[in-house]
Amino acid sequence: NWNNVDLEFRLDCLNEMIGVLKDEKIEYSRLMAFEMGKPVSQAESEIDKCIWLCEYYFENASEFLKDKIINDNAQKYIITIQPLGIILGIMPWNFPFWQVFRFAVPTMIAGNTILLKHAPNVLGCAKAIQQIFEESSLPNNCYNNIIITHDQVSLLIKNKSQPS
């Protein structure tokens, strides 16, 4: 279970993803240019932003995820971050890497798994992102693209939110 994997291992996976993003930056930029007409220079900046985000969470996740203790005059409260399970993300087309990474990285670092519906006109980018996650040491099925319609998303949410 991914939610039981320690933070250090999750961060190791994230660090591997940083390496892939850096190594394949030009390829991913060209893919965005091909699929959606984004200028290559803007696409490169988008990948740089994804790298920055990954590095930011790599450096700060331990602090973000540790328990917070709040004292008021009457009581002491502890806020604990806990995984929720499978999180569905529905992404637009205009920033096909950035929108996914800003959602997926903190979601994954917090111990959740991801189902991601990408926009239908950037499915090559969606596939490339899935490969980035798969090339890290993440266990299988921590990140999964789903290719479904908006109507099917409604059915998925309805079916998955029912108590078992």
Regions found by a protein language model. Give the residues of each.
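Rossmann-like NAD(P) dinucleotide-binding subdomain of oxidoreductase/dehydrogenase enzymes
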Residues: 66-164
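N-terminal Rossmann-like NAD(P)+-binding subdomain of aldehyde/semialdehyde dehydrogenases
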Residues: 1-75
